[in-house]
Amino acid sequence: MAQGATGLGTTLELLLQDFRHALRQLARSPAFTGIVIATLAVGIGSTTAIFSVVEAVLLRPLPYPESDRLVRIIERPAEPARDIGYQQSLAAIWTRDLPVLRAQASTLSHVGVYAGVTAVVIVESGSPPLRLEGTRLSPAVFEMLGARPALGRIFLSAEETPSTEPVVVIGYSMWQQYFGGRPDVLGRTITVDGKVSTIVGVMPKAFQFPDAQTLLWTPYTLDARMARIPPIARLADGISDKAASSNVEAVLRRIRKTEPRFPGSTSISAPSRFEVRTIQEHLVAPVRPLIVVLASAVAFLLLIACVNVTNLLLNRNAARCQEVAVRIALGASPARVARYVLTETLLVATCGGAAGVLFAFGSVSLLRTLGTSLARRDLTPGVSIPRLEEIRIDATALSFTVAITVCVGLLVGLLPVVRYALARTTTLDLHSAPSRGGRAALLVVQSALATMALVGGGLLVHSFVKLANVDPGYDARHLLTFTLRSASPAGSIRLYQEVADRLRALPGVKAAGYAELLPMVRFRTGGPLAPARPMPAGTPPPPAPIDMRTVSHDFVSAMGMRIVAGRSLREGDPRAVLMNETLERSGFLGPRALGQQVLVAGRPGPFEVVGIVRDVRQYGLDQNPDPQVFVDARHLPPGNPAPYFAVRVDGDPMSYIASAREAVREIDSSAALDNVATMQQVVSNGLSRPRLFAVLAAAFAIAGAFLAAIGVYGITAYAVTQRTRELAIRLAIGARPRALLVLAIRRSVAWTTVGLFVGVAGSVALSRYLQGVLFGITPADPVTFTVVSAAFLVVAILATLIPARRIARVDPLVALRTL
């Protein structure tokens, strides 16, 4: 026992000696130590940061009990061959059919709906109105989320009926900020969108739904407005997604056959396919491919950093071979020397890991700042990274950092350790060094990895440039947009038209109109459509669902949308509709849609198709146009949320904000402009997600290329140092410096070029996995490959020229005398 303790003590003492000696050696060469630590910090820190994104967005369950049972219903065209552009979306049902879905979908234990709103709130009588983020939801939503209030209660089932007294549940932050955290807040009344509502509950600080910005919740009442909204549900115990999908599809198809009935029409919409998908999967599906691409880019960056550090360590150890040879000659075993080298490597890796943690903290903070600043939630909801506020460096991320640091330390120290462990004294003299083949292999690997990273980043950047230049189908220039919020009860179509007329009368205003939704505002408002008369046999059914756009008669001209056939809506013909080119091409009205009559779900008809509108990309520039119909806003159901206004002006749209506010106040003194932005800002905000990922991918790729260039520089500098005597002799016998310069860089450039070709080949093989995140280009885009290859080759050549230029300044006599 004592002997074992003595052996352990001896081992620990030797390790401590190795540690102290390694610390002294690293302190003697601060430049080398700083470069290695910085290189590892970038690699390990970037890896930790992207791991925190993957863990928070893709892996971490939602913060609700049994969150894997919370589901949304996805609707797709039943026949893929008939998919004429309608994108995968949430299935929507009429609110009147919600009880039917609850009763017949036996695989779902709870079914409800919710919708985010910007509510106008008056906390106390006489206080100014506040515009706070809120959510209208069914009482069943609180139940399925397992919500437990900190004070009071949640909504009762009966409170989703219109006849009940208005109630509200407030969030913890609203309770603290506006009520001082007083427990007597229950029973107090506040005015929410013109309705005096009683506070019945306060949610705990940790509760967030649907996001952290929501401050209050009101019941979603199932009234007669005939709104269409996507449901949210919880699976019953023991029910799989597949079983629920089958049950829900059968129920929704029965519902679709009965809603709404089109008198005199024998045509029915084409059937749809429905499937149940977990909420987490629905949230992350749009960003998963992009996050995987970023994770791959960071993996390449980490590998480049490891290769770079390995090369630096090999060169450093080569310069210390005489010291190592003396140690072995004095009795130290190769294994003892190898252990010391490993200790030094792990020490520098630990320092790099510690610096990497700081780098990761900064990177995550920057990511959250960029994600928040680049995507305004009020303009285009759903374009930022989901669960962005949950991304952080926590204990899980730090544990990952420790693991990756140890792995990196072992990886970069492997070659030097093996070299010394297998060494003999006779081979470790002053001139021993890494073999030429070893240096060439490192150079090829670095160049190949950097090329692949640059190609991936270049493809994303090129794709974003293509996306940003897509024609949206309207003119976004010189266009001011906003919503109208009032402390009085919900406005009427007459009020909205008065506002539009007053805006149109302002000097410099060319056109003004309003619509239920703007393009790029990612909510779908779909429903069935049918011909008003029987169609000949063989006529295809209408596509399902069809995007319904409720607009004022002057909205089309204000947006700069182009009528390709027929005319636009007029003030005197409320029974007229417009349809887009995609819907016309579906052929459900025969060869010519213009002049035909249709029945529109939820609205008294029939309606005449008076014009065909050029396709507009309503849900994003990367989304194909859906089949769309434009209905006059006079059919907007009463009580609907305030519409979006579009005002076309001369000059800078933002300079018209003050006059627009004044014009609105002249009509309604309690009204104010909300969500104010130019249409160009709205479009740009809709591009925030692909822009952010393109910037991050490019940054990681450039960082990888920079590290690779440093590696090329280091290998070339070492080669020049090793060949100084040979080059000095050549200079002494008359060789020209330029010829020696070419001789010095020839091998580095040659092996870099080989690595470039290997990287291009690897990029061709791997870039096909980017197919789903690219727009307007192919994964083998020749422009990107050419530009990236040329740019990296230029950078690599410059990296070799910098150390090689020292040859021209070499004095042969001095060089020969010092060697």
Q: Where are the language model's segments positioned?
A:
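Membrane-proximal extracellular/periplasmic loop immediately following the first transmembrane helix
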Residues: 62-118, 230-232, 277, 385, ...
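Short, strongly hydrophobic transmembrane alpha-helices
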Residues: 30-57, 61, 66, 304-306, ...
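Alpha-helical transmembrane segments of integral membrane proteins
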Residues: 2-34, 279-284, 312-339, 343, ...
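N-terminal membrane-entry
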Residues: 284-300, 396-400, 685-704, 746-750, ...
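Interfacial "coupling" helices/loops that link adjacent transmembrane helices in transporter permeases
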Residues: 305-349, 429-430, 710-750, 756, ...
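Small-residue-rich transmembrane alpha-helices
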Residues: 50-53, 310, 346-423, 459-462, ...
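Mid-to-C-terminal secondary-structure elements
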Residues: 119, 133-157, 165-292, 365, ...
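Alpha-helical transmembrane segments
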Residues: 42-76, 364-375, 449-478, 717, ...
